[in-house]
Regions:
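A short SAM/SAH-binding and catalytic strip from SAM-dependent methyltransferases
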Residues: 152-173
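Conserved beta-strand signature within the Rossmann-like core of class I S-adenosyl-L-methionine
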Residues: 178-199
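Rossmann-like AdoMet/SAM-dependent catalytic core
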Residues: 201-277
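Glycine-rich phosphate-binding loop signature in dinucleotide/nucleotide-binding domains
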Residues: 75-78, 150-156
Length: 277
């Protein structure tokens, strides 16, 4: 959310993400940091600093958010609900209440859900009636059971969002989650991001020595990846049809080039959009 908040300080024509809630949802120290980026030199220094963690990281994160936002906007007339897996401090559900009144299920670990509830109370005063916070651990709990306890129905045409999550899960959990989503109504949509499997196995580090050391060597935080050529067949196993797959080069052309900003992207992470058959 720091990225989305910082992007609000870019002029509208150069901004990659529009989200006026982003800064408000951050804890106080991060709000102070974001406030400092109203000064262009500080903002540019922060963006350049992100390159030390992972070259192209800033552009990748911003572009994936735009890709997901565009797909959700295109689908609003055709869906009955939204499910956000690994919601964290994501503001998408609250931006959505300005446009439509459909149920939005935000799923995350219990500790993150508790923090989200406090944050929403601080920013909005109360949780919107259309938003349901669902606490569970995808590694151990059943997703559909937890959703059903909060009013989810299998006849809903749902827009599922899984942004920046799959790499943190085991392959068993990713497959079990997709197996559960077999029950989604035809016409449901799924948008997700994934890192490439050759990064996970260490074959290609995509120039991100610091990131690889942090998520694969010092701590085993990332576990799962795919290769772009595998995605269609992988989804088809669970009744989903790949509609669009967007790599960094395509997303840069779509979102960054028109702004005139000189950002680089990494080939590490891709985005995919699918429909339930």
């Amino acid at each position: 959310m720091v990225l989305a908040a910082v992007e609000q300080n870019e002029p509208p024509g150069r901004r990659l993400v529009d989200d006026d809630f982003a800064e408000l949802f951050l804890p106080a120290p991060l709000r102070w940091l974001v406030g400092a980026t109203r000064f262009a030199p500080v903002r540019h220094l922060m963006i350049r600093g992100s390159e030390f963690t992972g070259p192209g990281l800033w552009a990748n994160l911003a572009c994936r958010k735009r890709f997901i936002a565009d797909k959700l906007k295109e689908s609003l007339d055709d869906i009955n609900a939204v499910v956000i897996l690994g919601a964290g401090l994501d503001t998408r559900a609250y931006l959505l209440t300005r446009r439509v009144r459909i149920p939005v299920f935000e799923v995350d670990l219990p500790v993150n859900v508790a923090r989200k509830f406090k944050t929403v109370r601080r920013v909005l005063g109360e949780l919107p009636l259309s938003v349901r916070l669902v606490a569970l651990d995808l590694e151990h709990d059943d997703l559909l059971t937890a959703l059903a306890e909060h009013g989810y129905r299998t006849d809903y045409r749902v827009f599922f969002i899984c942004e920046g999550v799959t790499q943190y899960l085991s392959e068993v959990t990713v497959r079990r989650t997709l197996d559960g989503l077999r029950a989604a109504a035809p016409g449901s949509r799924l948008v997700f991001t994934y890192v490439r499997s050759d990064f996970i196995d260490g074959t290609n580090r995509y120039g991100t020595r610091t990131l690889y050391r942090n998520v694969r060597q010092r701590r085993q935080l990332w576990h799962f990846g795919l290769q772009p050529g595998e995605v269609a067949d992988f989804l088809a196993e669970y009744g989903w049809r790949l509609v669009e797959q967007a790599g960094p080069d395509e997303l840069m052309q779509r979102y960054v080039v028109p702004t005139g900003r000189k950002l680089k992207a990494s080939q590490l992470e891709w985005s995919a959009y699918a429909e339930k058959t």
